[in-house]
Regions:
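Cytoplasmic helix-loop-helix junction between adjacent transmembrane helices
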Residues: 113-150
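Helix-loop-helix hairpin linking two adjacent transmembrane segments in secondary transporters
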Residues: 138, 146-191
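C-terminal transmembrane helical hairpin of 12-TM major facilitator-type secondary transporters
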Residues: 286-338
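Conserved MFS/SLC helix-loop-helix module at the cytosolic interface between two early adjacent transmembrane helices
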Residues: 69-108, 283-286
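Paired small-residue
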Residues: 97, 108-116, 315-323
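Flexible cytoplasmic inter-helical loops of multi-pass small-molecule transporters
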Residues: 188-210, 406-415
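Structural signature of the two symmetry-related core transmembrane helices
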Residues: 85-99, 290-305, 384
């Protein structure tokens, strides 16, 4: 082990401006993710869909995203193509694929559009994390947390739009597509890499192997998989749970009830934006592994408790939904930061895309688990199965902390310590 080198804090005067630009772009770009899910009740009536088929409106996006991230990883595109260009082109494609939902379509065509949307979003999410990491080192946890928080609010936005009277399929879908197109312009015109760029390299078949062979990366991804097992299933089915609970409580169908359910669904997801900022701030001070453990334990507990609010007073449902929505995403950005710290700099883009690819592959399973479980045991226990994810996630993160010897930062939030390896 060589000498310890202490780097100066992040000081570039444009870093916060760039963070704001990327956060806005990520919010706008990711708004197409749940565009179909937000209007699923109307689509279900149009195509006579079963609960499982409704779930595929989200699962198909996950499938496209997995294929897209796998392609980026195998071809090393995240480390070869400039992130700005990759983001802009991908966001524009996502906008077009999503807008196609307003055409006279069949359910099969809609699924194809959702797969294409997810495929394109593979060029929006991971590159944004890499881009902001070129502007921050000492406060990278907070910066990446802001990006993940922004995309969380973006994914919730279709539910907010749908909460307004008269906002049917066409307004929700087209507003989301316009937002994604705007994101493409913002990044394409306004973004440049920061003072801490990651090394680029030519294509190499062995780069994925370099990433996967790193044990810290595998443990970080193990924790991430536990987190993802719970996250997207919660986001997909919590709005359905809320609507069913409100109906069971006796609220009559109508515009007011629709506004309540969609407004609460938006809030339960969007509160994650604040959670990601909180998580980044805490992680930079108490340690990433500490924050992840606390968030996983809290979210897993919420997944068990929320079922007991079914059919009860709306304020109780709202309280537990907001708590779950907060903790289920609070740690998400920190897994990405752990990944950027676990591989050589020239492999960061590929490491992030492989991480997200396997994570979203797992979400396809957990999303489809809930409908059959709900039919068997009802909403009271349906979400409890998701607590399995946090249990395994905590185990992986504790092993990572033991491996790295790091349970909390050894320095303040404005200092970065780099240990030089002997050659």
């Amino acid at each position: 082990m060589g000498p310890i080198v202490t780097e100066s804090p992040d000081t570039h005067p444009r870093r916060w401006q760039v963070l704001a630009l990327l956060a806005v772009a990520e919010l706008l770009g990711m708004s197409v993710w749940f565009a179909a899910s937000a209007v699923a009740p109307q689509l279900a009536v149009r195509w006579s869909l079963s609960p499982s088929e409704i779930g595929w409106l989200t699962t198909s996006v996950q499938l496209g995203f997995v294929v897209g991230t796998a392609a980026l990883a195998i071809l090393n595109l995240a480390d070869i193509v400039p992130s700005r260009a990759l983001f802009a082109v991908a966001a524009l494609i996502a906008a077009c694929a999503n807008a196609a939902l307003v055409l006279p379509t069949t359910y099969g065509f809609a699924l194809a559009c959702r797969i294409a949307t997810g495929f394109a979003l593979a060029g929006v999410y991971p590159p944004a994390m890499k881009m902001i990491a070129t502007w921050f080192r000492a406060r990278r946890g907070l910066a990446v947390g802001a990006i993940v928080g922004a995309l969380t609010v973006g994914k919730a936005t279709p539910y907010l739009v749908h909460a307004f009277p008269g906002a049917g399929v066409r307004p929700v879908v087209l507003i989301a597509s316009a937002a994604a197109a705007t994101a493409a312009v913002l990044v394409g015109v306004g973004y440049r890499d920061g003072p801490y760029p990651f090394a680029s390299r030519r294509f190499s078949w062995g780069l994925v192997g370099t990433v996967v062979s790193a044990r810290p990366w595998r443990l970080a991804v193990g924790g991430y998989l536990g987190h993802m097992f719970e996250l997207y299933s919660a986001w997909t089915w919590l709005p359905v749970f809320v609507a069913a609970s409100v109906a069971a409580h006796g609220l009559p169908p109508g515009p007011r009830t629709t506004a309540i359910t969609n407004g609460l669904s938006f809030a339960a997801i969007a509160v994650g934006g604040v959670a990601c900022l909180w998580g980044g701030w805490i992680a930079d001070r108490r340690g990433r592994e500490w924050l992840v453990t606390v968030a996983l334990a809290a979210s897993g507990t919420c997944s068990i408790l929320i079922g007991f609010s079914f059919g009860k007073a709306t304020w109780l449902v709202a309280t537990l939904a907001l708590l779950w929505g907060f903790f289920v995403i609070a740690d998400s950005a920190q897994f990405s930061v752990l990944v950027t710290e676990s591989v050589p700099s020239h492999a960061v883009g590929t490491a992030l895309t492989v991480q997200t690819s396997v994570g979203f592959l797992l979400t396809m399973v957990s999303i489809q688990l809930i409908p059959p479980i709900e039919r068997l045991v009802g909403w009271r226990w349906a979400f409890s199965v998701l607590a399995i994810g946090p249990v395994f996630g905590i185990a992986a993160v504790r092993r990572l902390a033991a491996l790295t010897g790091r349970t909390r930062p050894s320095t303040g939030p404005d200092t970065v310590v780099v240990r030089e390896r002997t050659r």
